């Protein structure tokens, strides 16, 4: 039950008026000045705080609902911003939400509820608790609150704001300070079946598509995939009615199937480019990991595209991942109006649809191909009890994304010659230039050169040319357009006056004054729409400057400042935080005093409520040193729990471990154990025994080399018996051995005339253990005969490769 506060009545006596004005906590929504304010007996007494004539703040102040929707969904939360364009500001304000055609003097006139974001900036009015006003009167340029949309059946709602700049300056609650939102039809499911009409618009129009993903654990908590949630890369195109990318009731192509199941846009882009005559622009935007982040952390993805009279439809899709085959997107959105113009803006909330190629019912269902393939259809809340969108009452599915398509320029001759904004004028200045959207993204060009002189030197038709350079072709399968462009022109010999005239655009609006206090300069520009046909130079001015005065009474101690920079990111990831912006001194005060203007500003910022994140964590520390000094190891980093998890368990990791790699460690030679000693090689007398070991690992990366692999030692069994017959046999063997050596030496001596050589030595050890080394052996002169020549009788040396295996 809501208690209505007693209405505050204003007396016309000066004493009570003086008391009422300082105590007022809000602006009035009445159109009368103070002298005409009647006593109010209604639910919210309207307290007038500002005197003077009402003024409309179409350019200075604005009331904006995030996403700029035209419709609201019952029960949905919307961020509302009230702002002033620099150098304007406001000290006080009042914000209310009324049903259409209601005065606000009854409780039931008000629609929805506001939610305070910053209690130091905003508060509910004490005498009108459904309205929001400032907490303290001071200079400000922006405030934000949340508005919770009313229940179904409320109808259209009007958000109204009033502004106080100074206590006796002005207030207003219409124009840019009024926002009308109508209730979204409960039967709306994102499916449209409107006929596609022939387009009668002229020229081309350029649009920007911005995709706002709202799919998060807060909005869709059931079975939300916390670790793999994402939107795939956006893929689509502007096309004619003869080509359909996808549509409800149709079957998914192979390209749509690969987007829906794999998140891959490659095949879809190939299909679109194959329809070259039916497609004007291929629309692409990068994927989003994770699916949702605040806009001050990650900007919403966007893409620009163009449309013309025959290709005035726009379609796109993106996969909701992970999912069986669920997507969101638009199909054949017509950007041409019945009045032969181009749509200014489209805002559409999106719900997921099923591509009909997989029969899974949950985000992470195993692959289950649908055989036979089914038609594309929107998901509903009654599809399956295990579905994350299931509602036994059959309610509508909460939208998972919003797409905003906004016209940013028009080119060429337009049927409707009245421009909607300055961008349209600027974009219409050079109709002879080709649309940049025709150039594939895989072709990187330099800028066009200036037009050359006309090829005709007489009063005759000729051609002029401009060029550009192809810097890179990223995909050789996609052809790149020409690097030269030609245009007809008239030679300079023409005497016709019209041949030397040039057509100019209208002047665009004046720039802001160059200073914030005192006398400064401002400028405006225009552009050459059509150069003289005779190829001569256009001499008409394209820029004008004039003096401007801002605050004539500013003192000599005032200083000139630059414009404010962009706001920093919010210092908090949830709840209340701070953000800052800065500016610099351009010129110090003329009287030599110190500049007292502020060079930095800080204001509070509101992130999603912290209860959606049960624990607040510090940033990750730096990675620790690797656990080893060489080779493969591990390293760690930590973060701390900054606040107690009072609203739930903190399941986030406080430590992370990853592998690290340092230069390889030296590997020493590895050997087997020694074998047993062999038997003595003699049966009597002196002999020897040996033992060996094998190399298991060659040394690597500078490791210790391999030691000996063979050892021998002496052995003596017993003295040999001196049997004469045996002794003679040994003498005979020794004699034959000496004779054999002599014959060998003589045969070797024949190879080197005049020399007797010793046998080759054994090969030396290899100079390297791996990677390729060398070995050497020698043959030395044993005896040189007198008849020998020195050049033919000398020591010999041989070299060979060894250990050629890699390290």
UniProtKB/Swiss-Prot annotation:
UniProt xrefs under SUPFAM superfamilies: TSP-1 type 1 repeat
Gene Ontology terms: biological process: cell adhesion; negative regulation of amyloid-beta formation; positive regulation of amyloid precursor protein catabolic process; positive regulation of protein processing; protein processing
Entry keyword annotation includes Repeat: yes
PROSITE patterns named among the record's database cross-references: REELIN, SPONDIN, TSP1
Gene Ontology molecular function: extracellular matrix structural constituent; LBD domain binding; metal ion binding
Disulfide bonds: 44-128, 156-182, 199-336, 200-340, 202-415, 443-480, 454-489, 459-494, 502-538, 513-517, 548-554, 559-595, 570-574, 605-610, 615-650, 626-630, 660-665
Entry-linked Pfam families: Reeler, Spond_N, TSP1_spondin, TSP_1
GO CC aspect terms: endoplasmic reticulum lumen; extracellular matrix; extracellular space
Record domain TSP type-1: where: 442-495, 501-555, 558-611, 614-666, 668-721, 754-806
Subcellular location: Secreted, Extracellular space, Extracellular matrix
Domain Reelin: 29-194
Signal peptide segment: 1-28
Entry-listed glycosylation sites: 214, 448, 451, 507, 510, 564, 620, 623, 674, 681
Sites where the protein binds Ca(2+): 325, 354, 358
Keywords: Cell adhesion, Disulfide bond, Extracellular matrix, Glycoprotein, Metal-binding, Repeat, Secreted, Signal
CDD domains linked to this entry: Reeler
InterPro entries for this protein: Reeler_dom, Reeler_sf, Spondin/Thrombospondin_T1, Spondin_N, Spondin_N_sf, TSP1_rpt, TSP1_rpt_sf, TSP1_spondin_dom
Ranges where the Spondin domain occurs: 195-388
Tissue expression notes: Highest expression in lung, lower expression in brain, heart, kidney, liver and testis, and lowest expression in pancreas, skeletal muscle and ovary. Not expressed in spleen.
Function noted in UniProt: Cell adhesion protein that promotes the attachment of spinal cord and sensory neuron cells and the outgrowth of neurites in vitro. May contribute to the growth and guidance of axons in both the spinal cord and the PNS. Major factor for vascular smooth muscle cell.
Assembly mode: Binds to the central extracellular domain of APP and inhibits beta-secretase cleavage of APP.
Name the UniProt record assigns to this protein: Spondin-1
Species: Homo sapiens
Gene name per UniProt: SPON1
């Amino acid at each position: 039950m809501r208690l209505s506060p007693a209405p505050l009545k204003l007396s016309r006596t000066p004493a009570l008026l003086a008391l009422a004005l300082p105590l007022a906590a809000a602006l009035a929504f009445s159109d009368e000045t103070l002298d005409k304010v009647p006593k109010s007996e209604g639910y919210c007494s309207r307290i007038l705080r500002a005197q003077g004539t009402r003024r409309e703040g179409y350019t200075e102040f604005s009331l904006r609902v995030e996403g700029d929707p035209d419709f609201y969904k019952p029960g949905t939360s919307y961020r509302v911003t009230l702002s002033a364009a620099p150098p304007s500001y406001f000290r006080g304000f009042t914000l209310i939400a009324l049903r259409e055609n209601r005065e606000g003097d009854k409780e039931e006139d008000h629609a929805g509820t506001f939610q305070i974001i910053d209690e130091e900036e905003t508060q509910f009015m004490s005498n009108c608790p459904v309205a929001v006003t400032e907490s303290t009167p001071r200079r400000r340029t922006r405030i934000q609150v949340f508005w919770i949309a009313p229940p179904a059946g409320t109808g259209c709602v009007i958000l109204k704001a009033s502004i106080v700049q100074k206590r006796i300056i002005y207030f207003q609650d219409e124009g840019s300070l009024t926002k009308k939102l109508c209730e979204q039809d409960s039967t709306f499911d994102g499916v449209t079946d409107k006929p596609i009409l022939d387009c009668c618009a002229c020229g081309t129009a350029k649009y920007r598509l911005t995709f706002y993903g709202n799919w998060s654990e807060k909005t869709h908590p059931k079975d939300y995939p916390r670790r793999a949630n994402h939107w795939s890369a956006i893929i689509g195109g502007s096309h004619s009615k003869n080509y359909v990318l996808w549509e409800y009731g149709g079957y998914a192509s192979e390209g749509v199937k690969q987007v829906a199941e794999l998140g891959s846009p490659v095949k879809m882009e190939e299909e679109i480019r194959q329809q070259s005559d039916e497609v004007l622009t291929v629309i692409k935007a990068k994927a989003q990991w994770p699916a949702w982040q605040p806009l001050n952390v990650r900007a919403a993805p966007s893409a620009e595209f163009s449309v013309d009279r025959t290709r005035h439809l726009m379609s796109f899709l993106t996969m909701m991942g992970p999912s069986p085959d669920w997507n969101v997107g638009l199909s054949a959105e017509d950007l041409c109006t019945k009045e032969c113009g181009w749509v200014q803006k489209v805002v559409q909330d999106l719900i997921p649809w099923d591509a009909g190629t997989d029969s899974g019912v949950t985000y992470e269902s195993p692959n289950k191909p649908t055989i036979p393939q089914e038609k594309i259809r929107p998901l509903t809340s009654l599809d399956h009890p295990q579905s994350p969108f299931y509602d036994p009452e059959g309610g509508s599915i909460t939208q998972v994304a919003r797409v905003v398509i906004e016209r940013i320029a028009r080119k060429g001759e337009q049927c409707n010659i009245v421009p909607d904004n300055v961008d349209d004028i600027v974009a219409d200045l050079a109709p002879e230039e080709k649309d940049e959207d025709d150039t594939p993204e895989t072709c990187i060009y330099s800028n066009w050169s200036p037009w050359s002189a006309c090829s005709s030197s007489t009063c005759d038709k000729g051609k002029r040319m401009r060029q550009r350079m192809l810097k890179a072709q990223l995909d050789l399968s996609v052809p790149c357009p020409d690097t030269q462009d030609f245009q007809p022109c008239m030679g300079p010999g023409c005497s016709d006056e019209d041949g030397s005239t040039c057509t100019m655009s209208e002047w665009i609006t004046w720039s802001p004054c160059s200073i914030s206090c005192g006398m400064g300069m401002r400028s405006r520009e225009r552009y050459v729409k059509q150069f003289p046909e005779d190829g001569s130079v256009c001499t008409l001015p394209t820029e004008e400057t004039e003096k401007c005065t801002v605050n004539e009474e500013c003192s000599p101690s005032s200083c000139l400042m630059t414009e404010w920079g962009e706001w920093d990111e919010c210092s908090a990831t949830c709840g209340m935080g701070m953000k800052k912006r800065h500016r610099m001194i351009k010129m110090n005060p003329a009287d030599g005093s110190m500049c007292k203007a502020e060079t930095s500003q800080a204001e509070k910022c509101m992130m999603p409520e912290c209860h959606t994140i049960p624990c607040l964590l510090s940033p990750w520390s730096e990675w620790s040193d690797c656990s080893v000094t060489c080779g493969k190891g591990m390293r760690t980093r930590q973060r701390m729990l900054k606040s107690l998890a009072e609203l739930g368990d903190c399941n986030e990791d406080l430590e992370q471990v990853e592998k690290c790699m340092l230069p390889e460690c030296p590997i020493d030679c590895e050997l087997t154990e020694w074998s047993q000693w062999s038997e003595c090689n003699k049966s009597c007398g002196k002999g020897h025994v040996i033992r060996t070991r094998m190399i298991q690992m060659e040394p690597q990366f500078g490791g210790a080399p391999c030691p000996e692999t063979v050892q021998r030692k002496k052995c003596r069994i017993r003295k040999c018996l001196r049997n004469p017959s045996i002794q003679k046999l040994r003498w005979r063997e020794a004699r034959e051995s000496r004779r054999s050596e002599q014959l060998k030496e003589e045969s070797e001596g024949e190879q080197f005339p005049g020399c007797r050589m010793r046998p080759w030595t054994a090969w030396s050890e290899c100079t390297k253990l791996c990677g390729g080394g060398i070995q050497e052996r020698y043959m030395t002169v044993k005896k040189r005969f007198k008849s020998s020549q020195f050049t033919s009788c000398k020591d010999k040396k041989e070299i060979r490769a060894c250990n050629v295996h890699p390290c």
